[in-house]
Amino acid sequence: MNKIRYPAVAGLFYPSHPDELIDMIEQCYLHKFGPKSMPVHGTYEKPIGLLCPHAGYVYSGPIQAHSYYELSKRVDALEETTVVILGPNHTGLGSGVSVMDGIWRTPLGDVKCDEEFVEELWRKCEIVDLDETAHLNEHSIEVQLPFLKHLELLNIAKFKIVPICMMFQDYETAVEVGYFIAKIAKELNRRIVVIASSDLTHYEPQEIASKKDAIVIKDILEMNEKELYEDVVNYNISMCGYGPVIAMLKAMKTLGAEKAKLLAYATSGDITGDYSAVVGYASAIVE
């Protein structure tokens, strides 16, 4: 019997009632900080990498919606797309790098893991363990799923996921994980999307946060994962998911990606009006 991973932050980070959740996702798309358009029907042509924030939808949902709007233009429902979602481990539970199989439940329906991809990953990449403990209370991957499920409900795409939770975010680990994501995607001939779930600077004044965030955004747009790691360390940037972003960039470059584009940037202060201690949010696409 398949393991079921139940939502940990439904009713906290996003509504737990399906109708309210759909309304909120639609509001994120149409918000002044969002793409101001609903998702569209597109065509899958090549691997896609995305940077997505993972705070409560009221704070970062409109920025997050930019990534899913661009994704909608680059996927279709003709066959399933495997979405590898890399998130940091905020709980301190579980293994250093943890992948999980089974089913992830959302208020909008279940999302299945790509079991074959998951098995190949933990068997071939020594740093990755098959471990559900890290995932049970972790929000960074979970908050991406309602946006994916919403695209399915619109018949824009069909998805399976590979959820990877990273407590270890050192450069060598992140690059190795990224390399194996690309290697297995090629071996299994998967349609592939790689999402790095990360917020940027945490709880600093707007002026400082925006300057620090500009540094890491520049590194991401230059697809320079080594520089990103060094800047996070040297400038003491409190970006929670730099490891997932490094892994995403490595995977995408290995899969032939050539360019990255910033889709949107804002801080929690732009939403709340309190600029004294903000969190930075960005969406970007790599292809």
From Swiss-Prot:
Superkingdom of the source species: Archaea
InterPro entries per record: MEMO1_fam
Pfam families the record matches: Memo
HAMAP family found in the cross-reference section: MEMO1
Family membership: Belongs to the MEMO1 family.
Name by which UniProt lists this protein: MEMO1 family protein MJ0403
Native source species: Methanocaldococcus jannaschii (strain ATCC 43067 / DSM 2661 / JAL-1 / JCM 10045 / NBRC 100440) (Methanococcus jannaschii)
